[in-house]
Amino acid sequence: MDERDVAMIDALRRAHEAFNRGDFDAAVEIAHPEVEFVPPGGQAARSGAEALRAWMEPDAFEEQRIEPLDFRVQGNKVLVRQHAQARGAGSGIELDIENWTVWTFDDDLLVTRVESYLPHQESEALEAAGLRE
């Protein structure tokens, strides 16, 4: 693993830590102002760091956490296997899944694209990251 790989992973660790403590401004500090975010489940893509931040902010959840389980680097992309937990604000229904996110970095170590994948989309996440099992 080279220095750039370590720097990308460190940036993602800091972003996850910020997200988990509810500091969404700090969580998007690694994002390019024109970052493209592709939410899970076929939702429409969103553009811009503010749109990414707005998506992170809980609306239907009273609690939410995303813990990275491992990182796989391929060029300028990092595939993160993660454990996501959330609890519905009104319903109390709990979400507890393992899913994937592919983060694409530019030369300045800013994230230009974030692609989120549901539990059953592992092969799509691997393909998006340029990895094959």
Predicted regions and their residues:
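Short, low-complexity N-terminal intrinsically disordered segments enriched in polar/charged residues
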Residues: 1-30, 123-133
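A solvent-exposed, acidic/Ser-Thr-rich amphipathic alpha-helical stretch
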Residues: 7-10, 24-77, 123
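Short, cysteine-centered beta-strand-loop-beta hairpins and adjacent loop/turn segments enriched
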Residues: 61, 86-96
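Hydrophobic/aromatic beta-strand elements that line small-molecule binding cavities or substrate pockets
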Residues: 66-72, 84-85, 98-104, 115
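A short, structured loop/turn motif at beta-sheet edges
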Residues: 71-78, 104-110
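Short, well-ordered beta-strand segments in beta-rich or mixed alpha/beta enzyme
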Residues: 78-86
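Short beta-strand edge/turn micro-motifs at domain boundaries
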Residues: 100-125
